[in-house]
């Protein structure tokens, strides 16, 4: 009688050390994950930047070398939210760099290997004079091969439909290292749960500041779903929601989220501030997984989590967050 072997399982967090803004891709049969490490988040980088994990089975992750050769120090020491995409025979790393939470620029670095080293191209994707704060670059390739860059930037105008704060944008890419223009708005904050901080001092004034950030786009059944994180990344208000469009450039709608994030939110006492997600369809080529970070219970480290993403009649929902529990990785 043949012995049936149990399927391998994940157990969250899948990597125990600090690993925020996680992004996973596959190259040459190997899974890679890149994220914001503790030194990058604290602005205390030494040597190369952005930790990279590797896995052969999507279950067990080991730390390798960091990916990015540090660009000129005048750009700052806080490096956030890396994403890597292969194109042709090279790999393109998108990230932001700045001084604390000020003057962040979107940059691109290139390598011949998924592990790096990645070397910065020497220029920003956006004009820092016109756009003094831009973060969370997410390149997306549509079915026709055209690339677009989703990202987050600040807005100071206030209308009945839009609050001051960080919002989502999309721009058509001229090449892997150039944008055609600054693009257009995807979504502005509209709801109380998206508040980052009341009475926040920014740009010489005090604002009721709201935040949408961490865009990630998945096309599903002909529609474009732009996932994003809203609220404050440092507490339990943070969570994942989405907006939907019939065209990659919009208009995007997010009706039905007035009460809070629908995809992923805090579970008090267990998982705090889950967010900044990416999505990967692995390892069976059919099952979608939401890759995200969440705080440990002591609020000392953001760690990498993976849970299944399901598409329901009401929209995408995460089968989580889970903590310390195991589930089958479908192979």
Task: Locate the predicted segments by residue.
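Carbohydrate-active catalytic/glycan-binding domains of CAZyme proteins
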Residues: 1-331
């Amino acid at each position: 009688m043949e012995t049936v072997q149990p399927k391998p399982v994940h157990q969250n967090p899948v990597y125990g050390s600090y690993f925020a803004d996680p992004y996973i891709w596959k190259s040459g049969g190997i899974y890679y994950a890149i994220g914001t490490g503790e030194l990058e988040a604290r602005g205390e980088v030494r040597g190369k930047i952005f930790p990279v994990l590797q896995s052969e089975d999507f279950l067990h992750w080991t730390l390798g070398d960091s990916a990015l050769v540090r660009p000129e120090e005048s750009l700052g020491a806080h490096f956030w939210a890396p994403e890597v995409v292969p194109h042709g025979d090279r790999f393109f790393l998108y990230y932001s760099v700045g001084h604390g939470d000020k003057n962040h620029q979107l940059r691109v670095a290139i390598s011949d290997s998924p592990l790096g080293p990645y070397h910065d191209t020497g220029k920003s994707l956006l004009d820092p004079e016109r756009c003094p704060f831009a973060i969370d670059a997410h390149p997306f390739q549509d079915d026709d091969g055209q690339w677009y860059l989703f990202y987050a930037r600040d807005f100071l105008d206030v209308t009945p439909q839009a609050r001051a704060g960080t919002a989502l944008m999309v721009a058509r890419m001229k090449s892997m290292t150039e944008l055609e223009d600054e693009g257009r708005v995807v979504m502005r904050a509209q709801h109380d749960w998206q508040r980052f901080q009341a009475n926040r001092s920014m740009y010489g004034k005090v604002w009721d500041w709201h935040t949408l950030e961490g865009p990630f786009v998945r096309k599903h059944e002909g529609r474009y779903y732009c996932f994003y994180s809203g609220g404050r990344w440092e507490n339990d208000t943070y969570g994942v929601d989405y907006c939907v469009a019939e065209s990659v450039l919009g208009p995007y709608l997010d009706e039905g989220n007035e009460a809070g994030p629908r995809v992923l939110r805090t579970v008090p006492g267990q998982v705090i501030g889950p967010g900044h997600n990416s999505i990967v369809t692995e390892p069976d080529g059919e099952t979608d997984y939401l890759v995200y970070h969440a705080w440990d219970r002591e609020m000392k480290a953001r760690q990498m989590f993976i849970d299944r993403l399901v598409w329901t009649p009401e929209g995408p929902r995460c089968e989580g967050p889970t903590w310390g529990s195991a589930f089958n990785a479908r192979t």
